[in-house]
Amino acid sequence: MAEPPQQTPAALGFSMPAEWEPHRATWLGWPHNPTDWPGKLDTIRWVYTEIVRWIAPGEAVRMLVNSRTEEKLARKFLTRAGVGLRRVEFIVHPTNRGWTRDSGPVFVRRNVGQAVSPAVRAKTAIVHFHFNGWAKYSDWQKDRRVPETAARRLRKRLFDAQWKGRQLVLEGGGIDVNGRGTLLTTEECYLDPKTQVRNPGLGRQELEAALKEYLGVTNVFWLGGGVAGDDTHGHVDDICRFVNPTTVVLVREDNPGDINFRPLAENWERIRDLRLEDGSKPEVVALPIPGPLFFDGNRLPASYANFYIANRAVLVPTFNDPNDRVALGILGELFKDRAVVGIHALDLVLGFGTLHCLTQQEPAD
């Protein structure tokens, strides 16, 4: 049962951990919607097997499937690719799409050393932000219920995200945290008053207050816009990511003639003002961006910042681009405790997202 609005995660000692902290599992949604990848669905399924192959050795994989028939299909693909199924759990939950980062459960964890109510025993819980298809698409009703299914399956407390009597809309790809209290997001995604408006009438101060209550953060920093072609309208996980508590990578476009040059340059100006939760300045590492990719005349949101940090590996989207090697080298230096692996994402990005968009971490207790 969802908690009443006054019992927020922060009030009960919960906060969102960083992605590099230990996971119990990674959540994925087996691809089934042909409109996301026209004519490419089987190709995408093979990419999923590669994703699971690298994640499963270090943690469980919880795979949402539309039906038992889809489960059989997923098992067939994974088995043929040599992926052991011992650590793969299949959960039947019909979905509209497979972008689990945005519609899936957002986990928070309680600091066991923090004094809270004796009634709060669980170390982890789920926040149900109310997915609405990025305020763009009409088919989201099945996706919205994924956090409820996750809470029942795991027997976790479910916090119903509301603010001033309204359901609060947020996607996992629209935020990034360092696990110490600082959260990154963008104005394009959550403050644009005209385009893909998630929470009409809620301004900067109200959204910051809501983020602090439901994710347990103390410090919110706003970047400007995202990359061209991002149909979510400015998700931060395509431009700027924490890689440890005091370091971020920030995407940079060096070609003044590219449409991404100006908004990304503005973010580099803004990042100078970023202070962490303790008032210190973070280290900022430049991450390149691949050359322009188009399909049917549309710019695709190809970005190396859409990597996913699993327990034993960091999965990085690659695009048959000379900058693939550069990005892998930069991230390899930043994640020396994990294998940094390139995952071919030219087909994935046709659906306007890649690795981070598909995955959602479940932290260890």
Regions found by a protein language model. Name each.
Residues 1-113, 120-365:
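The feature marks the mature, well-folded catalytic cores of soluble enzymes
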